[in-house]
């Protein structure tokens, strides 16, 4: 009876040059996404009056009446407007303040 070995011979499987794995590529893409600033988006709603939204933009963000009115009109005509940007913590705080004032606001990474 012949002797049978169950162990395979050692094969040097090291590639000649380093290779990039998909996991490394994904990490780079995620890091680039995290480098983008966050923005606060205010959405149109059927409840708040236009002059109230203008007032809130002035009070919370220090916008002039003209700038606050411009942003309010953008919300009214386009359905949304970006009203602030910055770090995630800052934008989360801005969204919280807008919610406390009764406005519909969300946050997202800046698309530009």
Curated annotation (Swiss-Prot):
Matching Pfam families: ClpS (PF02617)
Lineage top rank: taxon: Bacteria
Signal peptide from the UniProt entry: none
Biological process per Gene Ontology, one example term: proteolysis
Residue stretches in coiled coil: none
Subunit structure: Binds to the N-terminal domain of the chaperone ClpA.
NCBIfam families documented for this protein: PRK00033.1-1 (NF000668)
Record family assignment: Belongs to the ClpS family.
Summary of the function given for this chain in its UniProt record: Involved in the modulation of the specificity of the ClpAP-mediated ATP-dependent protein degradation.
Entries under HAMAP family matching the protein: ClpS
Name this polypeptide is given: ATP-dependent Clp protease adapter protein ClpS
Record gene name: clpS
């Amino acid at each position: 009876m012949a002797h049978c070995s169950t162990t395979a011979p050692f094969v040097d499987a090291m590639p000649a040059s380093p290779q990039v794995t998909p996991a490394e590529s994904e990490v780079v893409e995620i890091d680039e996404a995290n480098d983008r600033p966050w923005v606060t988006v205010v959405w149109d709603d059927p409840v708040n009056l236009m002059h109230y939204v203008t007032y809130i933009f002035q009070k919370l963000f220090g916008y002039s009446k003209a700038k606050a009115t411009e942003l309010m009109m953008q919300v009214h005509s386009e359905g949304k407007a970006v009203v602030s940007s910055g770090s995630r913590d800052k934008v989360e705080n801005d969204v919280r303040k807008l919610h406390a004032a009764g406005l519909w606001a969300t946050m997202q990474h800046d698309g530009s």
